Amino acid sequence: MKLLMLCREPRLYSCQRLKEAAKRQGHEMDILDPNRCLLKLSQNPPHFQIFYQENSGSKPYLLPDYDAVLPRFGTTSTQMGCSVLQHFEGKGTFCLNLSQAFLNARDKWKSLQLLLKTGVPVPNSFLSGGEVQAQATIPHISSPTILKMLNGSQGIGVILAEKPQSAVSIMEAFKQTNISMLQQDFIEEAGNADIRCFVIGDQVVATMQRIGQDGEFRANCHRGGKTEKIILSDDEKQIAIRATKAIGLDVAGVDLIRSKNGLLVLEVNASPGLEMIEKTSGVDIAAEIIDYIEINAFINLR
């Protein structure tokens, strides 16, 4: 098969692992930056064409047909990346995570709405409109509370406010820069630990527990946390699978937290990193992803 990965940083561990796994299984893989794509819509066939400019001085060339597309772009490329994905969808190409599902996952508030709508447990959460005074949110939030930027990643834009007035001050400051923030109950009993599940299709293929540094409430590895192996029950795995389906994804990193009221879903990531979870779990996730593409791209072609 001829595969395409949409990614701005081809040297990243995850991109290299996926390319190696594809090559090992006899496939070609191109890695291209979605921000260098030119999309063309035509009334007459071919209706969907995609051109690519290698650099600022080169002439854009027409991309060939691909058997499958893997989106691995970051939050700064979401809009263009999803436009490119949608173009491939228009061409009938199999995409590992559709554009709408990708957009769902990148919107933290919409994700929570979709999860709760389908019965997936999430922390109590709160979002106020731009004309609502921050002070008016105090009766509706717990203390301490977590504040999150709607499009943050890797723990960036996540703040712990110990007191209600601190939360108000933070919200007022961000409001000045037109940045909306959602508020969530702080799950104190979980300490500084959470769980990452890697879901492919109908299976949880790998898990790990993430533990934040001393004095750090965020468990993200990018914030200096450590990881450990963890075994989940079948019921806990089902929550991660249901969360993935609620967002509409084929492949996802689902972040879970254990609370006194049971397991809760914190977030569903459409482009989860492979490095820490492969090294912690010992699972060759890259090969599992290529296996999944082989099966589903073939079904898509029939």
From Swiss-Prot:
Residues 112-294 form the ATP-grasp domain. GO terms for cellular component: cytoplasm. One of its GO terms (molecular function) is metal ion binding. Mg(2+) 1 binds at residues 255, 267. Mg(2+) 2 binds at residues 267, 269. Binds 2 magnesium or manganese ions per subunit. It is an enzyme of class 6 (ligase). The keyword Protein transport does not apply. Keywords: ATP-binding, Ligase, Magnesium, Manganese, Metal-binding, Nucleotide-binding, Protein biosynthesis. Its cofactor is Mg(2+); Mn(2+). Mn(2+) 2 binds at residues 267, 269. GO terms for biological process: protein modification process; SOS response; translation. Gene3D superfamilies: 3.40.50.20, ATP-grasp fold, A domain (3.30.1490.20), ATP-grasp fold, B domain (3.30.470.20). Belongs to the RimK family. PANTHER family: RIBOSOMAL PROTEIN BS6--L-GLUTAMATE LIGASE, RIBOSOMAL PROTEIN S6 MODIFICATION PROTEIN. This is Probable alpha-L-glutamate ligase.
